[in-house]
UniProtKB/Swiss-Prot annotation:
It comes from the Bacteria. One of its GO terms (molecular function) is structural constituent of ribosome. Belongs to the bacterial ribosomal protein bL19 family. GO terms for biological process: translation. This is Large ribosomal subunit protein bL19. This protein is located at the 30S-50S ribosomal subunit interface and may play a role in the structure and function of the aminoacyl-tRNA binding site. The keyword Ribosomal protein applies. Keywords: Ribonucleoprotein, Ribosomal protein. PROSITE patterns: RIBOSOMAL_L19 (PS01015). GO terms for cellular component: cytosolic large ribosomal subunit.
């Protein structure tokens, strides 16, 4: 029975997901339905956490909008996500960057990873 579930989950996985790590700046384009219209909405920020669970994988993106911190959790293989673009690679030494929630301004900056 579990082999059937694994096979179905494998078919649902997206193949075009770029490799990114915590600290990277990404732009996620998401399909949004407003009434009868369907349009793309971009959400650009820093990846602060990644949860690897196969089909149930997710990542958290944080940005500052009008001086207020906004975090959004995206399911990596969701059909709602149109594209994920890595804008900048960040050099961090931790897997979860929750400490950025308390930081503002220059102390919330992340060095760029070279190479």
């Amino acid at each position: 029975m579990s082999n059937i579930i694994k096979q179905i989950e494998q078919e649902q996985l997206k193949q075009d997901v770029p490799s990114f790590r915590p600290g990277d700046s990404v732009e996620v384009k998401v399909w949004v339905v407003e009434g009868a219209k369907k349009r793309l909405q971009a959400f650009e920020g820093v990846v602060i956490a990644i949860r690897n669970r196969g089909l149930h994988s997710a990542f958290t993106v944080r940005k500052i909008s009008n001086g207020e911190g906004v975090e959004r959790v995206f399911q990596t293989h969701s059909p709602v996500i149109d594209s994920i673009t890595v804008k900048r690679r960040g050099a961090v030494r931790q897997a979860k960057l929750y400490y950025l929630r308390e930081r503002t301004g220059k102390s919330a900056r992340i060095k760029e990873r070279l190479g």
